[in-house]
From Swiss-Prot:
GO cellular component: nucleoplasm
Matches recorded under InterPro entries: Galactose-bd-like_sf
Subunit and interaction comment: Interacts with NR2C2/TR4.
Described function: May act as a repressor of NR2C2-mediated transactivation by suppressing the binding between NR2C2/TR4 and the TR4-response element in target genes.
Entry keywords, A to Z: Nucleus
Protein name: Nuclear receptor 2C2-associated protein
Name of the coding gene: Nr2c2ap
Similarity annotation: Belongs to the NR2C2AP family.
Length: 140
């Protein structure tokens, strides 16, 4: 059964936070299901989010909701398991829209993920994400 794989024991990291204001724009807002909060990166050539799961998971879908004008035209999902080096799972190409976008992911068992957001629509390279959902199943 497909479910959200991000849990309280999932360790998340981000490339940057706008003005280092984690309280208002921090990574916790990626997963809080609140329409009023977001992760807002600082400027830079590319931005990323990494996730370390407490156990192996099988990812089937990724859902991302950007703020229009602060999205990524090209994104890359990488994963690994058991301390191995990250390897590319898939490239995906989000639209510059406020809508929640769903991307099917080739099924792969991982305990670590990294999403890299490249070619941002913002001139300064900032990314704003209201929702990030990693869907799939816990590996058994």
């Amino acid at each position: 059964m497909t479910q959200s794989l991000v849990c309280p024991d999932t360790v998340s990291r981000v490339s940057s936070v706008l003005n280092r204001n984690s309280r208002q724009f921090g990574k916790k807002h990626l997963f809080d299901q609140d329409e009023e909060t977001c992760w807002n990166s600082d400027q830079g050539p590319s931005q990323w989010v990494s996730l370390e799961f407490p156990q192996c998971v099988q990812i089937t879908q990724l859902q991302v909701q950007f703020q229009g004008g602060f999205s990524s035209r090209h994104s890359c999902l990488e994963g690994s398991r058991g301390g191995e080096a990250l390897s590319k799972i898939v490239d995906f190409y989000p639209e510059d829209t406020n809508a929640l976008q769903t991307f099917s992911i080739p099924t792969m068992e991982v305990d670590r993920l990294k999403l890299t957001f490249e070619d941002t629509t913002d001139f300064f390279g900032r990314v704003v994400i209201y929702h990030l959902r990693v869907l799939g199943e816990k590996a058994g």
